[in-house]
Amino acid sequence: MPFALGQRWISDTESELGLGTVVQVEGRMVTLLFPATGENRMFSRAEAPLTRVIFNPNDTVESHEGWSITVTEVVEKDQLVVYHGTHSETGETVSLRETLISHNIRFNKPQDRLFAGQIDRLDRFGIRYQCQLLRHKLASSDLLGLQGPRVGLIAHQQWIAHEVGRRYAPRVLLADEVGLGKTIEAGLIMHQQLLTGRAERILVIVPDTLRHQWLVEMLRRFNLRFSVFDEDRCVEAYADNDNPFYTEQLVICSLELLRKKKRLDQALDADWDLLVVDEAHHLEWSEDAPSRAYQVVEALSEVVPGVLLLTATPDQLGHQSHFARLRLLDPDRFYDYDAFLTEEQGYQAVAEAAEALSGEKKLNDSAINSLTELLSEKDIAPSIRLIQANEVDPEQQQAARDGLLQELLDRHGTGRVLYRNSRASVKGFPKRIFNPHPQAMPEQYVTAERVNAMMSGKKTPQAKALEALSPEKLYQAFESDSASWWKFDTRVDWLIAFLKSHRSKKVLIIASQAETALSLEEALRTREGILATVFHEGMSIIERDKAGAYFAQEDAGAQALICSEIGSEGRNFQFASHLVLFDLPLNPDLLEQRIGRLDRIGQKNDIQIHLPYLEGTAQERLMQWYHHGLNAFELTCPSGHVLFNEFAEELTQVLCEDDADAMTQLLNHTQHKYKELKQAMERGRDKLLEINSHGGARAAALIERLAQKDNDTHLVGSVIRLWDIIGVDQEDNGENTIVLRPSEHMLFPTYPGLPEDGVTVTFDRETALSRDDIAFISEEHPLVQTGLDLITGSETGTTSVAVLKNKALPAGTLFLELIYMADASAPKSSQLYRYLPPTPIRVLLDKNGNNLATKVDYNNFEKQLSAVNRHIASKLVNASQPLLHPLLAKGQEQAQQGLDALLVDARASMTSQLTAELERLEALKAVNPNIREEELEYVRNQMAELNGYLDASQLQLDAIRMVLVSHV
């Protein structure tokens, strides 16, 4: 290369240094000073990664003094360049020597980089275009946020997330039965809200015992990095902000923390977009005395736009508390408990109409009359005729049924606020097999009960019943050696024998009290050396996690995990299928929670429920009531709480006194009422609610689409190629897995999210679900998103020169390929990407300016191209400049036509969708007060904002490739 003092060059490998000046040429070496950074670089003259900077006529060049010149003539003298032209401000004729050009000039625009000789490798141009196409595909998908989480494609979960996650500020109660995956539904909704920009700041309130579990679950399944806040963390955060909640975007904390007025005030002032409350059935309320927990959540729900309440038992703690939770979501809608009860009485007619529509038979007169009355403002006659017709396409009939069903669900009841799936409507659960094991009552307990009976005159019947259910507690109360009960308790003998005969099985044991759990662990360890671990509320979160992990280990882990009632809440152990109930809780909901630790979606085996009970005691009588009255061991019992409240007095009496006639009478009454409630639930609101909650055929279609995306081999190829280009080491690890590691030759100094010691990944959902240590890669995964951002956010691939070997074309024929981006700058929360996502517009010009992009497929064209040495490419560009400048202007015109067409479509789509949504909401609001005015106002404002953003849309040249035909 011919170097001379004062010449301006740019580094091909360190463009951030700015413009360099040759300060020394000696022998085979050349030294450049980069004044913008004050750094020197020495290069070999023969192989210097440098490009000579020479501007062209019509370019605007800035001097180091700050003024600019529009170049009209370029003169070279003594190997240095002088630019003649017009002063950009005064209009005077001026000259500018290259030594006086601004040191900070960066060649960011593709055309500037091309003319400056900063030409990328051919494959980088291709990967940049593929990245832009992938970003466009992801942003324009209505499945955004559902594809990436490491969860099974379970219809009702994905359906609820799809319906709720795309709303503005959703306010809903997720009330699926135990084991149906409410945490996953909440995670999917949060993931969707964050990816679509509808939410940026989220506060999750969970029981203290579940904080760490939520933290791990959100990271492992959804790649959401929450921070756990407790009092210590709040104190530490003062160094960064007076309000600790402003130091993180995604926060998990307990209700205990927010009971403190100072912390609650700070949380109220923290501008959250979404509030999530787990175990919401603990929020007790009465009109006169709402609980402190309820008041905390109520205060937050008044200032946070979006609210998700999670509860497995909507009526636990009473129907009034269920109403109170709905009141948190929409106090204007649920303003009066009596009015709510009156409204519920009208649900049966709606449910009957929905039942008729969800079948396949023709509608009877009663169903038609109900539909006509319920949908009086709609013209439903055409749909009715279609359903009743004989020779009509079944798909059309089904569409008519679905349409009317959707109208019905939209207009009546709590369908938009409450989602509740039951096991009856969700398939795939194992059987529950109940195994009672009667044991003889130890004499020590008989004596303790006799003594207690003489001393318990003033105790309430419920207190007496609870004592009768735990004879070991009574014994401990009267004996100094509180630990000795497990030495003679026949249930402990049975438990040891059972574990010894099932050594290869994992067994979950649940007892009411933490002290009982600890004593059982001691008994197993000291009497037989059985490996067991304990799980109770007195342990820290980390201690509980370690215990759970020890139990989960297949080879060296504990055979048994012994949990207390409270300690096991919210924890799931589907890998075990044997459950031992060492005692029974005096609440059918708590019994269901115990069984729900194993009876969940994902359980592969039938669940064996074992109950060692003491014969002739309160334990046996409670077992009979649960088993023969409620069938609560082998089936879920949604009416359990109602039945318990109704028969609490009789049940308590039977538990305290052994009266066979009273027991028989109680069982008869319970069975009769159980059947009544079961039939009423079948007829009433639950049926309608479940039709809306599980999504039916629409949910199945959604799952089919997600499964098709899982099988997209094109995505796998694109992502692997992306990692290849960036320089990520990829090692095939077998079993559909790859190990990714940073390498020393990566394009970028760091790859955020890629650990130094590597990470194992898979593109296969089933593989990811079977192993927690493997990341599930989809187009939504941070490792993919980061890769796309690294490429598209840098200059990688913005310029390229290639040779087309095609003898059908004259040698020297020139093509210019331009990739423009439709650039509509708008905040993510505006949802503009739904109508105008970042869209690449490809223009392929021949030398006459004709656009061949629609005639010449990109992939076919790409296959015919060959790379060109960078120095040769630079010379080819310089020689072709007279042709390239007018072609660039022509390309801008062609791309503008493409943008105009995109804008027309985007505006039409936006207007059509939002107008339809607004009209739908307005129609619904007239008949269903469940529609909030904020939702309507949001749609109106969104239309106005989006029109403004579309008006301001511009074209951005993203990449440029010059192609020359060669016959060599």
Swiss-Prot record:
GO MF annotation list: ATP binding; DNA binding; helicase activity; hydrolase activity, acting on acid anhydrides
Chain positions of motif DEAH box: 278-281
UniProt domain Helicase C-terminal: residue ranges: 491-641
UniProt cross-references to CDD domains, sorted A to Z: DEXDc_RapA, SF2_C_SNF
Domain Helicase ATP-binding: 163-332
Protein name: RNA polymerase-associated protein RapA
Organism: Shewanella denitrificans (strain OS217 / ATCC BAA-1090 / DSM 15013)
Enzyme Commission number(s) of this protein: 3.6.4.-
Domain of life: Bacteria
Top enzyme category: hydrolase
Family: Belongs to the SNF2/RAD54 helicase family. RapA subfamily.
GO biological process: regulation of DNA-templated transcription
One Pfam family here: Tudor_RapA
Residues where ATP binds: D176, E177, V178, G179, L180, G181, K182, T183
InterPro entries: Helicase_ATP-bd (IPR014001), Helicase_C-like (IPR001650), Helicase_RapA (IPR023949), P-loop_NTPase (IPR027417), RapA_C (IPR022737), SNF2-like_sf (IPR038718), SNF2/RAD54-like_C (IPR049730), SNF2_N (IPR000330)
